[in-house]
């Protein structure tokens, strides 16, 4: 989470947007595909930064049995309900005025599903959105594993 924050948030955040990183009390090591998890989270954060002009963006994770749930919540413009069920479809965008071609979230969905996980979104127009993934993982005791991720702020 710290890597995502440093790469995506530090240079792009305005005084109007607060970044919050939440994690459980205990640090957690898990065997995950670090490159792909980072790719998905960075896309969620980039979208949140793009659509949030004031308020906050919250990056969080929690451990649930043999899975990790990672989410990015924002207080941006939200997604219209008629477009909500299409946000993970290829070439779909919630807002035609924002730059991009609409494939980022479909790529995220594909990555998460290849890892055996699931992806979702909750949103309210003019109130914000929450994008989340739940991926299976195996806890490990140290960072020496090739694809391990240290889930900490």
Question: Model regions: which residues?
Answer:
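Short, small-residue-biased leader/transition segments that mark boundaries at the very start
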Residues: 1-5
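Conserved catalytic submotifs in the C-terminal HATPase_c
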Residues: 16-28
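Short conserved segment of the HATPase_c
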Residues: 79-91
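Acidic ATP/Mg2+-coordinating residue in the GHKL
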Residues: 74
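Short helix-loop "hinge" at the ATP-lid/N-box region of the Bergerat-fold HATPase_c
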Residues: 48-49
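Short alpha-helical Gxxx[C/S/T] motif in the catalytic ATP-binding
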Residues: 104, 108
């Amino acid at each position: 989470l710290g890597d995502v924050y440093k790469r995506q948030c530090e240079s792009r955040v305005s005084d109007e947007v607060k970044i919050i990183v939440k994690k459980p009390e205990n640090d957690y090591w898990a065997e995950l595909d670090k490159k792909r998890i980072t790719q998905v989270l960075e896309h969620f954060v980039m979208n949140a930064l793009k659509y949030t002009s004031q308020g906050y963006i919250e990056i969080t994770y929690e451990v649930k049995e043999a899975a990790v749930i990672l989410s990015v919540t924002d207080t941006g413009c939200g997604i219209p309900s008629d477009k909500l069920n299409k946000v993970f479809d290829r070439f779909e965008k919630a807002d035609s005025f924002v730059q991009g071609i609409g494939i980022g979230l479909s790529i995220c969905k594909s990555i998460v599903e290849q890892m055996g996980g699931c992806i979702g979104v909750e949103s309210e127009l003019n109130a914000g959105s929450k994008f989340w993934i739940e991926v299976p993982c195996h806890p490990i005791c140290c960072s020496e594993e090739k694809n391990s991720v240290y889930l900490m702020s």
